From Swiss-Prot:
GO biological process, one term: adenine catabolic process
Superkingdom field: Bacteria
Gene from which this protein is expressed: ade
Cofactor: Mn(2+)
Record protein name field: Adenine deaminase
GO MF term list: adenine deaminase activity
Alphabetical UniProt keywords: Hydrolase, Manganese
Reactions catalysed, as given in the entry: adenine + H2O + H(+) = hypoxanthine + NH4(+)
SUPFAM superfamilies assigned: Composite domain of metallo-dependent hydrolases, Metallo-dependent hydrolases
Top EC class, one word: hydrolase
């Protein structure tokens, strides 16, 4: 659009393409509700005021007009549906822009995976921007499927204007110790005036200062107000996260006040489709924040203009002249139930349903089988007893953090076995990319599983397969079924597969609809409950067991990882440990 074309409409000399009458505008600049008409020309807002002529006129009868919602940080792969299906899921909930870090598929398929996300969403009515994965692999403590070097990034950034910056820099020891490759990636992007996203849970003081000196300007890993206050005070945009497992919204809402609100944004990070369909997306965060006493306009700002300004999306996040005509209509601001969604001035969703067709193109990459590993056998899972206590990974259903427990193991015939009565189950991390078996065995506490075994190919960040179980035989059945499917989620018991969800796209995403995936996830959860599982979303919890950049104790295919000290530790710790 040429500037000269919109000016006559803005001046009221020509009719608008779309005129919204009797609107109550949520003005994220003034912090006020403004009653006016809105004139729209092509894909832009031309003006706000007493406009009276439009080729199409919609009388809102006092309904609220809110900028299209923005998710400040997420991994589309965590929705377990294709990028197009993800768009079809979040658009009716008012999300018109997402800032995606595709480091999940990048760890499996490299830049080919990133390009797949970009190409598959061309022409889709969702503003999908990319933060180029910074940490592929995330650490040198596991095997993954690809590497992305600074040289790989140079041409990619020039080729794809949707790249906004560098994705979450997870291996903070590399940064504060001056790792040349990590710093070179930051230098490349910052000299192109791109943003650098952070990932630095629990780090404070001088190490935090050093990390921020590397031009890293955001963090989504805060789990308490004090941590968030320090990072905000040191210049970071705080991305408050509310996903399927990592739910920090309630804990961090007290952070928000009239002095610091511009530096707080909302994001989902990792959210399953059943949670999006049942709860909502960014709209859920707004509703919850308002319910907990946050001013409605402040909540809307965290989901719109704050994020747009941080990421230099200069024509997004507000209802104002010259801004993109991406907006949602809500009848009641406090309840924040979205009745209509407009993208580029076109009505695309009404009352939670799409009113347009969004076609999905098939891509050859969707057929690539990324599993090279052979089947496993029960003997591969054996752990000989040394007469010593062992380290156990303690997981929590509502957090991605883990703790290291030190416990006496249960033994049988000279081997350590799962102890259902004490909720100490065997866990294995198995390299999917290795043609020869490469795996590590550990033990996990906190799932409550009483029978059977569970396996998944979703395992941040390398996405090797993990399997936990009450017995080795069912672990073998579950793991081998995942291998045969080329990725997916599996529950087995008594030697049989009870439920499964194939994930053929990079072993991360399904080719089914969100509704079908949600239904299958619901069935998986039902089966898990029947087997005694106490974790709300075991597959999401299990997906973080291998994440060797978030404290405290993790497992990768190479061994148990002490994340604090960034090194491997033995399963055994001696009788006095």
């Amino acid at each position: 659009m040429n500037i000269i074309d919109i000016i006559p409409v803005a001046r009221g000399k020509q009719p608008a393409d779309l005129l919204l009458k009797n609107a109550r505008i949520v003005n994220v600049f003034s912090g006020e509700i403004e009653r006016a008409n809105i004139a729209i020309f092509r894909k832009r807002i031309a003006g706000i005021g007493d406009y009276s002529e439009g080729k199409q006129v919609i009388d809102l009868h006092g309904a609220y007009v809110v900028p299209g919602l923005i998710d400040a940080h997420l991994h589309i792969e965590s929705s377990m549906v294709s990028p197009v299906e993800f768009a079809k899921t979040v658009l009716p909930r008012g999300t018109t822009t997402v800032i995606a870090d595709p480091h999940e598929i990048a760890n499996v398929l490299g830049l080919d995976g990133v390009e797949y996300l970009i190409k598959s969403t061309e022409g889709v009515p969702l503003n999908l921007y990319i933060m180029l994965p910074s940490s592929v692999p995330a650490t040198n403590l596991e095997n993954n499927g690809a590497r992305i070097s600074v040289m790989d990034m140079i041409g990619f950034v020039e080729k794809h204007p949707r790249v906004l910056g560098l994705g979450e820099v997870m291996n903070y020891p590399d940064i504060i110790n001056g790792d040349h490759d990590s710093i070179a990636k930051i230098e490349l992007l910052r000299h192109k005036y791109k943003k650098i996203d952070g990932h630095i849970p629990g780090i404070s003081g001088k190490d935090l200062n050093a990390y921020i000196c590397a031009f890293i300007r955001s963090d989504h890993e805060c789990t308490n107000v004090e941590e968030a206050k320090e990072k905000l005070a040191r210049g970071m945009q705080i991305l408050v996260r509310e996903g399927s497992v990592a739910r920090n919204l309630d804990e961090l809402l007290p952070l928000i006040n009239e002095k610091n609100y511009p530096f707080i944004s909302f994001c989902t990070d990792d959210k399953h489709p059943n949670d999006i369909l049942n709860e909502g997306h960014i709209d859920y965060m707004i509703r919850y924040a308002i319910k907990k006493g946050i001013d409605p306009i402040t909540a809307v700002r965290a989901a719109t203009i704050n994020t747009a300004r941080h990421y230099n999306l200069r024509s997004m996040g507000a209802i104002a002249p010259g801004y993109k005509a991406d907006f949602v209509i809500v009848d009641n601001l406090e309840e924040f139930r979205i009745s209509m969604v407009f993208k580029d001035s076109k009505l695309i969703a009404e009352n939670g349903k799409l009113v347009i067709d969004i076609n999905r193109e098939q891509f050859p990459l969707e057929e690539v089988n990324t599993f090279k590993c052979p089947h496993i056998e029960e003997k591969d899972l054996e752990v000989l007893n040394k007469g010593e206590n062992i380290r156990v990974i303690r997981v929590y259903g509502d957090d991605v953090l883990t703790k290291e427990l030190r416990m006496e193991p249960k033994t049988k015939d000279g081997r350590i076995v799962s102890d259902v009565n004490r909720d100490i189950l065997k866990v294995a991390s198995i390299c999917r990319y290795c043609e020869e078996k490469s795996m590590a065995i550990g033990f996990i506490n906190g799932t409550g599983l009483k029978q059977g075994a569970v396996a998944t190919s979703v395992g941040h960040d390398a996405h090797n397969m993990s399997v936990i179980g009450t017995n080795d035989a069912d672990m073998v059945v579950a793991a081998n079924r995942v291998i045969d499917m080329g990725g997916g989620l599996v529950i087995a018991n008594s030697g049989k597969v009870l439920a499964e969800l194939p994930l053929p796209i990079a072993g991360l995403m399904s080719n089914l609809s969100s509704k079908e995936v949600a239904e299958r996830l619901g069935h998986l959860k039902t089966v898990l409950k029947e087997l005694g599982c106490e974790v709300p979303d075991l597959f999401m919890t299990l997906s973080f067991v291998q994440l060797s950049v978030i404290p405290e104790l993790r497992i990768t295919n190479q061994g148990l990882v002490d994340v604090i000290n960034n090194n491997f530790v033995s399963l055994f710790i001696g009788k006095e440990g």
